[in-house]
């Protein structure tokens, strides 16, 4: 499955229009500025990510949901003294599908709407990148006994770079969403309950090396695993650049799930990973 397959049209005066498949806008800067994005991140037996059951998650689910690539038409304004605005019409997501019934069908009467506003500026020799993003959609069902789900979310954050030091803080608040994937992977039957999270990170570059510290947490009232739970990831990573294309990585992280209503969800997983990141 191709994550990104799109075309763009635009110019410096009026901006750019993207049409095709790309990452969503809600949570976009949250994940793209994750210090562990090119590392390993968390794994979980509960989430089916151990022993080849899936890929490692970075900080997905512990600080932000994954802005899953989706078909869209998105407009991005030109940069206006550091300010840029993006707004998109996205393929909506089934959040009201009852897999226990053969007669119901989730449907949406309107597309999913997402937006992101970013602002870059310099203050006292420090480079700042700030953002706020959001989404809204509604999903209904042909079975009138299944309640309509109105989903909405807000993401935000700031990154400050001072020489070789980088500090990033981000977070999100949402209702009626899957706290792991914005496309509600697996099409779970969601409810209009809350989820929120934050991610705090710092990194320092010295020579060809970069060390990063990370702590992320998501509190979910039950849309993730069907029962309220808190999810946390603590991590430290060392990156060593061989050249512009190859980076060696060593990472240690700890992932925890704490069920609020039942201890059966409780999990603690520690992972040490080494590897290489190749880009071209």
List where the protein language model places each region:
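Outer membrane beta-barrel
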Residues: 1-95, 109-111, 118-122, 160, ...
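Detector for outer-membrane/organellar transmembrane beta-barrel domains
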Residues: 115-236
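Outer-membrane beta-barrel "beta-signal"
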Residues: 240, 268-280
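Outer-membrane beta-barrel proteins
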Residues: 28-31, 85, 94-99, 139-143, ...
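Flexible, surface-exposed loop regions and adjacent strand-edge segments
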Residues: 35-40, 104, 184-189, 230-231, ...
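Residues that define the transmembrane beta-barrel architecture of outer-membrane proteins
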Residues: 1-3, 67-71, 109-113, 150-154, ...
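Outer-membrane beta-barrel architecture
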Residues: 16, 82-84, 125-131, 164-166, ...
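Outer-membrane beta-barrel pore domains and translocons
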Residues: 22-24, 67, 88-92, 120, ...
């Amino acid at each position: 499955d191709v994550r990104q397959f799109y075309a763009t049209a635009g110019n410096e005066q009026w901006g750019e229009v993207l049409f095709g498949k790309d990452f969503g806008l809600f949570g976009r800067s949250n994940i793209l500025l994750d210090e562990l994005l090119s590392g390993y991140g968390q794994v979980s037996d509960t989430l089916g990510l151990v022993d080849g059951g899936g890929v490692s998650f970075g900080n997905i689910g512990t600080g932000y949901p994954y802005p899953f690539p989706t078909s869209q038409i998105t407009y991005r304004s030109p940069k206006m003294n550091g300010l840029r605005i993006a707004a998109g019409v996205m393929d909506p997501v089934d959040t009201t599908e009852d897999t226990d019934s053969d007669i119901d069908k989730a449907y949406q009467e309107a597309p999913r709407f997402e937006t992101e506003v970013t602002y870059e500026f310099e203050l006292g020799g420090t480079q700042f990148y700030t953002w706020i993003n959001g989404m809204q959609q509604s999903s209904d069902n042909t079975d009138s006994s299944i309640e309509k789900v109105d989903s909405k979310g807000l993401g935000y954050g700031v990154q400050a770079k001072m020489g070789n030091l980088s500090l990033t803080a981000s977070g999100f608040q949402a209702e009626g969403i899957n706290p792991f994937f914005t496309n509600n992977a697996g099409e779970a039957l969601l409810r209009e309950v809350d989820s929120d999270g934050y991610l705090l990170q710092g990194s320092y570059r010295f020579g060809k090396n970069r060390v990063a510290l990370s702590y992320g947490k998501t509190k979910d009232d039950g849309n993730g695993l069907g029962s309220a739970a808190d999810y946390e990831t603590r991590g430290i990573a060392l990156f060593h650049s061989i050249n512009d294309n190859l980076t060696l990585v060593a990472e240690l992280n700890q992932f925890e799930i704490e069920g609020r209503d039942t201890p059966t969800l409780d999990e603690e997983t520690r992972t040490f990973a080494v590897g290489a990141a190749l880009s071209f």
